[in-house]
UniProtKB/Swiss-Prot annotation:
A motif ('KMSKS' region) lies at residues 576-580. It holds the Pfam family tRNA-synt_1. It comes from Pelodictyon phaeoclathratiforme (strain DSM 5477 / BU-1). Keywords: Aminoacyl-tRNA synthetase, ATP-binding, Cytoplasm, Ligase, Nucleotide-binding, Protein biosynthesis. This is Leucine--tRNA ligase. The lineage of its organism: Bacteria, Pseudomonadati, Chlorobiota, Chlorobiia, Chlorobiales. It catalyses: tRNA(Leu) + L-leucine + ATP = L-leucyl-tRNA(Leu) + AMP + diphosphate. GO terms for biological process: leucyl-tRNA aminoacylation. GO terms for molecular function: aminoacyl-tRNA deacylase activity; ATP binding; leucine-tRNA ligase activity.
Length: 807
């Protein structure tokens, strides 16, 4: 009887749905395990095989943990607000809601066809008013705590999309061919900087990949430095700069300010004013990426003004350059070209002085020297000397001297900036704020504030969202007077900042989440998703979670205990899958040809989960043959009914193999080493096939080990051998420690530490026996001939080493 995967998979998917097999209760008597995928944006292109990798890994973990006795929460939902649906609406007139619902049906169908054990009763959708009611509620709480405010700020404006982009989104959009410019706009901003220290400190508690934690540390960018005042010659003002290297003050030879600095035009002399104005105008058209790229040519303009170096008394020219950002530090820097590569390049380009103040092994006129480890030189005046001091001592001495002279003060700075939260588009959560004619703002109290129906989805001519074109929704009045609703909507990140909490209590209309359920289920034990979200979703979600912690809504400081980033699956051409390359492998096509179990096993067998690897159709053919081999263990080649299994004891060699497989598969599954777990199951299947053994215990053990990976075929075979309950309810087997020990071991023989041969010996053999066998080994015997043995070293079960010298 051949294995027909399409019939089997359809049968068991229908049965799981009918039986609510994976519906999760809030059973506080059982240990819990919360495993979560980064929920998808349901795009019109559907899922390809690369998307399935993380979902498969989380499902294997969920099924394995259930078999280990855990109450497992494994939910799925949709991050469904977003720009693509709105762009499609602009082109076609199709309401984004219609497009989104159709895309969700397609996505859900694919996920169900993969046999993923999600509790679909907890399904959420960020565009559902019952859901975004609570997204809006969180925004109001942020506003009440002073963490949401309005400001006219320079934003990243995408002309083609007619909307603002967060700093973190700019790189991707430019790479996609969009034009991004800077322009001032009234925006809602979230004060994420108020949580910078906590976001930084709590990273140490997390079981996350170190590279992701480091990316967040770099993005937050905490630095300790000094703000220094430079007297401006001829202006009776001071220019304050921020530096992390006050120890190099004696080497500062020029200052640079941002084009947006309030003194930029004021410092321009009459001769320089036109050039300065032109430079500032051009700089404002550039994105931060264009301005700060390390590879770009440095540009600048001299203001004509000078400032006095407080350490040397020398006048320093004040320049304007677009690589200095007004949003970081004070928007002004001191430049020490001998010891900073960017300053060195700028100095070389504009023929500015370069003075060595950190002892360098080479000529700093020819090459910059940036190491901190060396000592200070050429750094003394009548009041202070740094000469001979290492960095830390020089930093402290200079900082103290500047504070004593009231010429500076210690300061902590962050690269992290407040989160520009509003978007000029329709398909997003309305911001629940009313603007009254007297200038006051009041909160919408009747939540959810839902989106109105519109005929046109184009942004308004003023740069506002399409909501500005709908008078009946836009204007209103109440006991406080006439008002105009906020027309900006929230970014797509809003709904994903807290969705993991709603899965815990999705039907609750009175609270965001029931406190008792939250205490039971949180934190998320395992969160699986791509590393591309390191400084976007993951940072924003941590910020909102900390606010909710301060509000008493959640009981933990962090949402995600363990994070795992799966590697990308490339196309067969070893390139990232994309429509433009024509190398996308749609998930539905592969499922139709090979079935879900083969796809699940193949994707996990490709290599370590965290590594990038290419798809290979020949490989999945091999997995299909493996599944057929498993099938034949129960059905045989030509039998229409399952083979009668034996209750007789299995051979000892097979018994040992089985217990080794239990141990290996369990340990590897626990550690997400799925490829090696599958390899071990293949070894076990080969041993079963070779032995011809039809022992019930052996077959049942194999099926339970394999069931998290290939749930459909194992359910079918489990039923075929006489079980009337789901294999997902079968406990994971335990191994006998005595049976996993090797009975015959390979012992290495060394002479003077060099491997000269090996031999086989029973485990726990006495030292005397090991020495005898080692000396009799043919390849070793010839090396001992004519040698005097000075010492014999025996490590039981591992090696024998002879220390010798020539006679």
């Amino acid at each position: 009887m051949r294995y027909e995967f399409s019939k089997t998979e359809a049968k068991w998917q229908a049965w799981w749905k009918e039986q609510n097999t994976f519906k999760t209760g809030d059973d506080a008597d059982k240990p819990k395990y919360y495993v979560l995928d980064m929920f998808p944006y349901p795009s019109g292109t559907g899922l390809h095989v690369g998307h399935l990798e993380g979902y498969t890994a989380s499902d294997i973990t969920a099924r394995y943990k259930r078999s280990c006795g855990y109450n497992v929460l494994h939910p799925m939902g949709w991050d469904a607000f977003g720009l693509p649906a709105e762009q499609f609406a602009i082109k076609t007139g199709t309401h984004p809601k219609t497009t989104t619902e159709e895309n969700i049906r397609n996505f859900k169908g694919t996920l169900q066809a993969m046999g993923f054990s999600y509790d679909w009763s907890r399904e959420i959708n960020t565009t559902d008013p019952h859901y975004f009611k609570w997204t809006q509620w969180i925004f109001l709480k942020l506003y009440e705590r002073g963490l949401a405010y309005m400001s006219e700020v320079d934003v990243n404006w995408c002309e083609e999309l007619k909307t603002v982009l967060a700093n973190e989104e700019v790189d991707e959009k430019i790479a996609d061919g969009y034009t991004v410019v800077r322009r001032p706009l009234r925006q809602w901003v979230l004060k994420i900087t108020a949580y910078a220290d906590r976001l930084l400190a709590d990273l140490d508690e997390l079981n996350w990949p170190e590279n992701v934690k480091q990316m967040q540390r770099n993005w937050i960018g905490r630095s300790e430095g000094v703000e220094i005042d430079f007297e401006l010659r001829c202006h009776n003002k001071k220019l304050r700069v921020y530096t992390t290297r006050p120890d190099t003050l004696f080497g500062a030879t020029y200052l640079v300010i941002s084009p947006e600095h309030p003194l930029a035009e004021k410092l321009a002399t009459a001769q320089q004013l036109v050039e300065v104005k032109n430079y500032i105008s051009k700089a404002k058209l550039k994105t931060e990426l264009e301005r700060t790229g390390l590879q770009k040519e440095k540009t600048g303009v001299f203001t004509g003004s000078y400032a006095i170096n407080p350490a040397t008394g020398e006048p320093l020219p004040v320049w304007i350059s677009d690589f200095v950002l007004i949003s970081y530090g004070t928007g002004a820097i001191m430049s020490v070209p001998a010891h900073d590569s960017r300053d060195w390049e700028f100095a070389k380009q504009y023929n500015l002085p370069i003075i060595e103040v950190i002892q360098s092994p080479h000529d700093v006129q020819e090459r910059v020297f940036e190491e901190k480890e060396s000592i200070c030189v050429n750094s003394a005046n009548n009041e202070i000397t740094l000469n001979g001091l290492p960095f830390c001592e020089a930093f402290e001495r200079m900082a103290s001297w500047l504070e004593t002279k009231k010429a500076g003060e210690r300061k902590v700075n962050y690269k992290l900036r407040d989160w520009i939260f509003s978007r000029q588009r329709y398909w997003g959560e309305p911001i629940p704020i009313k603007h009254y004619h007297d200038g006051t703002l009041r909160l919408e109290t009747a939540l959810p504030l839902v989106l109105p129906e519109v005929e046109a989805y184009h942004p308004s001519s003023t740069g506002e969202s399409p909501l500005a074109n709908i008078p009946h929704w836009l204007y209103g009045s109440d006991e406080h007077g006439s008002f105009r609703r906020e027309t900006n909507t929230m970014p797509q990140w809003a709904g994903s900042c807290w969705y993991y909490l709603r899965f815990i209590d999705p039907e609750n209309q009175e609270k965001l989440v029931d406190p008792e359920k939250e205490r039971y289920w949180m934190n998320v034990d395992l969160y699986i998703g791509g590393a591309e979200h390191a400084v976007l979703h993951l940072l924003y979600a941590r910020f909102w979670h900390k606010v909710l912690f301060d509000l008493g809504v959640v009981s933990s400081r962090e949402p995600f205990k363990k994070l795992f980033n799966q590697g990308m699956i490339l196309g067969e051409d070893n390139e990232k899958m994309s429509k433009s390359r024509g190398n996308v492998i749609p998930a539905d096509h592969v499922l139709e040809r090979y079935g879900a179990d083969a796809v699940r096993l193949y994707e996990m067998f490709l290599g370590p989960l965290e590594q990038v690897k290419p798809w290979n159709t020949n490989g999945i053919e091999g997995i299909s043959r493996f599944l057929s081999k498993v099938w034949r263990l129960v059905y045989g080649e030509h039998e229409e009914s399952a083979t009668l299994l034996s209750e007789e004891a299995m051979p000892e060699e097979l018994l040992r193999r089985m217990h080794k497989s239990i141990k290996k598969v369990g340990e590897d599954t626990e550690q997400l080493k799925f490829n090696t777990a599958i390899s071990e199951m293949m070894v076990f299947v080969n041993e079963l096939q070779k032995s011809g053994c039809k022992n019930r215990s052996a077959i049942e053990t194999l099926l339970v080990l394999l069931s998290p990976y290939a749930p459909h075929i194992t359910e079918e075979l489990w039923e075929s051998i006489g079980h009337n309950y789901s294999i997902s309810q079968a406990p994971f087997p335990s191994f006998d420690p005595k049976l996993v020990e090797e009975s015959i071991l390979t012992i290495a023989v060394q002479i003077n530490g060099k491997l000269r041969g090996t031999f086989l010996a029973p485990a726990k053999s006495p030292k005397e026996l090991l020495l005898q066998e080692a000396k009799k080994t043919e390849s070793v015997f010839k090396f001992l001939d004519g040698q005097t043995i000075l010492r014999e070293i025996v490590v039981v079960d591992k090696l024998v080493n002879f220390v010798v010298k020539k006679e």
